Regions:
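Residues that scaffold, gate, or flank divalent-cation-dependent active/transport sites
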Residues: 1-64, 68
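A residue-level signal for conserved active-site and pocket-lining positions in enzyme catalytic cores
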Residues: 12, 22, 65, 100-101, ...
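Flexible, glycine/proline-enriched loop segments at strand-loop-helix junctions
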Residues: 35-38, 73-78, 124-125, 140-145, ...
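Active-site-proximal beta-alpha loop/turn segments in soluble metabolic enzymes
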Residues: 67-73, 137-139, 151
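Long, highly charged, low-complexity intrinsically disordered interaction regions
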Residues: 79-144
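Helix-hairpin-helix
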Residues: 100, 138-161, 166-172
Length: 172
């Protein structure tokens, strides 16, 4: 299966596609292909997760490269700087740049993380902490990018005129 970097996403390469199905497309786009080293990935993940867990009182590991952190122990005005410093600490300690998305729900945090990763102005930390930011983020998020919305559900929603996460929030 294929796993992508940010550039691969912008080229339209599909996540999880079997390599043999997209081999010609990858070659045509001059994409570098590497085999997986799950032992190394697991070791690096443990290092990152260890550093994250030292920084916050509560953490939920979601996958090999994702975790949800509880920042409620911080004052609201301190969260952004704390997150930037944490991201720098992780990169310095592991060589791995991370993105931190902060929001009141896990789904919004994943959307915030997407913005932090894909828009340079955020410096890898995006916070959705008010209604204006929530509305803007949801309006800019395609329904197929929402956590838990798969291909079949995306098709059904689009047939109902639901194209963005914002559209979804406006339905009954």
């Amino acid at each position: 299966d294929v796993y992508r970097s940010g550039n691969d996403i912008r080229l339209g390469i599909k996540m999880g596609a079997p390599f043999f199905q997209i081999k010609n497309e990858l070659e045509a786009k001059e994409v570098a292909v590497f085999s997986s080293n799950y032992t190394l990935y697991g070791d690096m993940s443990r290092r990152v997760m260890s550093l994250l867990s030292e920084a916050v009182p509560e953490m939920q590991i979601y996958s090999i490269d994702e975790a949800f952190l509880d920042f409620s122990f911080l004052e609201k005005d301190d969260i952004h700087n704390f997150a930037i410093q944490l991201a720098k600490k992780i990169e310095k300690g592991t060589g791995i740049p991370i993105t931190i998305g902060i929001a009141p729900t896990m789904t919004l945090a994943k959307i915030a993380s997407h913005f932090g990763k894909n828009y340079n102005g955020y410096q890898h930390v995006c916070i959705i902490d008010n209604e204006e930011k929530r509305k803007k983020a949801l309006q800019l998020t395609s329904i197929d990018e929402v956590w838990g919305v798969g291909h079949r559900l995306t098709t059904k929603m689009r047939n109902l005129g639901i194209n963005t996460a914002w559209d979804f929030t406006q339905t009954n």
